[in-house]
Amino acid sequence: MTFARINNVELNSESEADTFISNFTSGKFREIFPEAEILISIRTGPSSVTSVSVYKNKKTADSVADRRKSTIEGLKSLIKYLALTEGKVEILDLKKDSGVGTF
């Protein structure tokens, strides 16, 4: 069962959102969560970010829980609000040769 974790994060300011995002660019996101099959962060507003991590199964997702917690703890001063949701991926349809890749 493919499993996803979704983090909705509201940062204290736009500049702190920039700082938050910069902590995950240039492959850092992948270094922190190498078990994830898909990692995506979406800037949903000037000071908000939604991140989605997709794993092969819940067991794999659960195996990185402590790492996720310590990563968030290290960025705690930037965060105004954080909501975590998770669940079974029901549809995953990636267009073949879409050109979408690592940014």
Predicted regions and their residues:
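Short S/T/G/P-rich N-terminal loop/turn motif that feeds into the first structured element of a domain
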Residues: 1-73, 77-103
